[in-house]
C-alpha cells in the first residue's frame, strides 16, 4: 500500500482498522540481546580498557583519554558560528522557562487534627545523558536533557557520546551545565554509566536515545539491582496529523515529511474527514519529497504510513486516542477546541503555525517523548523525571491517640500483629503518663 492510497476508515472491518494502527514490530534479536549482555559483563569487569577496545572496534577511533578536557570543549565552541550559539541560547531560554514552571509546590496538610502529612521533592543525585553520534549530531537532545537536570538540582550530570564527539554536542553540554563528557558510545556507554569505570562515574539514572544496542542495554541495566534506572521505553518516532478542509496541504505535508526523514522505521499517519485534503496532501508530499536530501529514508518510512479518511473530526480524535501518537499535530479551523478530548499523545501541536519542528528544537516543551503506544501510560519527559517525591508524616500525641484505634483495627484485620503492637505499646504508654 503506497502513501497515495486513501483509506476509508468506515469501509474497513474492525480487524482491518486494528491492522491499520498496528506499529511495525520491534524487538531485540537474540543476537543483539546476547551481544549487549556480553558488553555489559566486559565493561563491569574490565572498565576503561574494554571501553577503549570497543571504541576502536565499533567507532573506528583510537581513544587514549576517555574524558574530554576543558580545552577541547573550549576549542569546539570556538569553531561554531555565533548564529548557532545564539540559536542554542534562545532555545535553552525557552526550555528553562517551561521546565522551571513545572516545579511542584510542596504539599503540607493536616489530614486530621494532629496528623501532619507532607510531600517534598528531591533531585535524582546523579544522571547520565547518552547522545548518539553519526552524520547528524543530535545536540538538541543535549539541551532537552541537560537543562531540566540543571533546574532539578542533580548534583552530578555526565554525558557520553561516540568519538569523535561533534563540536555542537560539546558546546551544548557546556552551555547547559554538564560537568563531565566522555568519548564512549553504544551499549558500552550505557554499561559504563550503569556500573561505573575508572573514568566514567556510576549514575543513578540514564537518559537519551540510541540504536537497537543502546535501547537493549538500557533495558538490561534497568532490570538489574546493580544497574541504573532509565528515562522511558524507546521505539521508532511517529507523527499523526488531524486535518480538516481548512488545513494548508503544504504545511501538513512538510510536517509528515519532517517525521519520515528521521528513519525508515518512522510512522506517519494523516486523519481527515475531507478526502480532497488527503489527495492534496499526498500530492504535496511527492513534490516536497523530491527536494529532500534524505528522500530515500523518508520514502521507506512512508511505505508503512497511512492516509485515512474519516466521517468527522470526532472520529479522527477517537482514532488518534486509540493509536496514542508520539507527536499529534492538529491542523483544523478551531484546533484548541479538540484538546480536551485528546487522552493519549506525547506532545500536541495546534494550528497552522505550530510545526513539530518547534517542539523538536525551541518552543520550550521537551522533545523526548513516549512512542510506540507508551503514551497510554507514560508522559513526555519533564522536570519530574529528574526528581523524586518523598512523603513525611508527623503525629502529635493527640493526633496519634485519635487515630490509634483505626490503625489497630486495620492491622488486626491483616493479621500483622507487630504492626498492631507498635500502636498498642504507645497507647499504653500514654495511659501510664496520664
Swiss-Prot record:
Q: Where is the signal peptide?
A: none
How is its cofactor bound, per UniProt? Binds 1 zinc ion per subunit.
Q: Quote the record's binding site residues for Zn(2+).
A: 259, 262, 360, 419
* Annotated coiled-coil segments of the chain: none
Q: Name one GO cellular component term.
A: cytosol
Residues engaged in binding substrate: 237, 259, 262, 327, 360, 414, 419
Among the GO molecular function terms of this UniProt record, one is: zinc ion binding
Q: What name is this protein filed under?
A: Histidinol dehydrogenase
Q: What is the native source organism of this protein?
A: Salmonella paratyphi A (strain ATCC 9150 / SARB42)
Q: Which gene encodes it?
A: hisD
